[in-house]
């Protein structure tokens, strides 16, 4: 269990393995919006500084290793809420003719929107990953996913709604649904 804020501990790992590191998939994060608002300095240090630590060490010790960053759709702020959704029986969807029907790509602006503290810290991380790719030649990519779930998802109220919904159902605890008349807007990615 390594804290990505601890540069010296990370550096020992990179020094030990150097170019034998063939791929970096960076998915470490502080994922809670509410927690980020309560502790913005800690949130920024985990999401932004931790990413910067990994990028710098990749550049120094494992330059040829592709760097895959698990970002978030929260870097777009509230811009996705402005999309022209149409209501269906069980969910909201965007028109098949809309340029974002197959998903939002990097053409959607990160600017001129309201971000959460979490969104800002991940936005910084996302942008610095891009800069290391463009300016330093690292092989970088950012995946801006939404509603990620899986077998190790914590099922916490503040993040991970699908696993929390299942957990609430099993324990017969109340689960509150906010917005969009209780209909699904985003797809879950497993």
Regions found by a protein language model. Give the residues of each.
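Conserved Rossmann-fold cofactor-binding substructure of NAD(P)-dependent oxidoreductases
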Residues: 2-20
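Conserved sequence/active-site signature of Rossmann-fold short-chain dehydrogenase/reductase
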Residues: 5, 75-76, 148-150, 189
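Conserved mid-core alpha-helix of short-chain dehydrogenase/reductase
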Residues: 9, 53-56, 128, 188
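Conserved Rossmann-fold NAD(P)-dependent oxidoreductase catalytic core, especially the SDR/UDP-sugar
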Residues: 23-26, 53-115
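Flexible cofactor-recognition loop at the NAD(P)H-binding site
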Residues: 29-30
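Short alpha-helical oligomerization interface
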Residues: 33-50
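Conserved catalytic Lys-bearing alpha helix of Rossmann-like short-chain dehydrogenase/reductases
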Residues: 48-54, 121-129
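NAD(P)-dependent short-chain dehydrogenase/reductase
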Residues: 81-103, 117, 127-188
């Amino acid at each position: 269990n390594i804290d990505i804020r601890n540069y010296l501990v990370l550096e020992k790992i990179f020094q030990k393995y150097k170019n034998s590191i063939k791929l970096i998939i960076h998915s470490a994060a502080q994922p809670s919006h509410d927690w980020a608002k309560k502790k913005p300095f800690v949130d920024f240090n985990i999401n932004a500084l931790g990413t910067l630590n990994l990028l710098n060490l990749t550049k120094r010790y494992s330059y040829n290793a592709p760097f895959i960053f698990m970002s978030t759709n929260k870097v777009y702020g509230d811009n996705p809420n402005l999309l022209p959704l149409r209501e269906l029986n069980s969910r909201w969807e965007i028109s098949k003719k809309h340029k974002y029907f197959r998903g939002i790509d990097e053409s959607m602006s990160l600017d001129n929107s309201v971000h959460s503290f979490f969104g800002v810290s991940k936005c910084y991380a996302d942008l610095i990953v891009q800069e290391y790719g463009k300016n330093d030649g690292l092989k970088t990519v950012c995946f801006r996913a939404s509603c990620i779930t899986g077998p190790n998802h914590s099922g916490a109220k503040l993040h991970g709604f699908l696993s929390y919904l299942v957990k609430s159902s099993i324990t017969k605890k109340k689960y509150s649904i906010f917005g969009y008349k209780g209909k699904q807007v985003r797809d879950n990615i497993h």
